């Protein structure tokens, strides 16, 4: 273990003439059987990435969209689901209740991020120190090693790096605000934001509410026509403005009253409230209901049971203890 003072000197000297080393490429299995590439940087590179993250994260957080929940402090999946449910419930007595949704899927989002566009977005969001931008640019172009061969990275942020989640949020932040300005977070003309959204509603603008977690996003609106229009508009927006592609096979327009949306391990539907013993408290309005995605959950339970069964097959005590520790880590997440 390196002494603290010596480590600080090493980091300071590295910042003066920083040259990141190529990351080590590894693959982890996804739930659908495919493999996701991970870039594992060196220990020194990880420390420097964490230093950069500490510097730029507060600046970025001040400009991030309020309904973006992935890889952000004090935000989690449950907050995104709760926001969707609140929006559905708030419009339960309105003819404009958001019961149609666009579920978005970006093809290889993290692997296709344009480096030049990302640096421009960092500048616009408030990162004006050119030394920091230079370090980030070098990190993005450091490349990776696979089977003892060096590969150049022209696109994407390395999944597995400490800074990558923050950079992906910076890249997709313009998309958040592009949709948000349509209705949910309009340009302020009134003293209170509620008056601005009311002004848009009176002008005939169809309500739309967007929620994003990492590269998964959902937009709620009140009509099928508006949902189909948004899908067409956003397909062009991602292609022309973000240099990314929406998967047309996996980008759905969904009626929450019949199918529900699959988002962050839940199936969110708009259904009637369950009848209560007191008829006076029961209404016929639709409310949002988050239900566990049983198909996805069933696969994970089956895999977990297989790992539990392996504990019984372990002959050595230390191997059995390691397997128990692994199973506990999976359960705890």
Residue positions per predicted region:
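Non-catalytic terminal/accessory segments
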Residues: 1-333
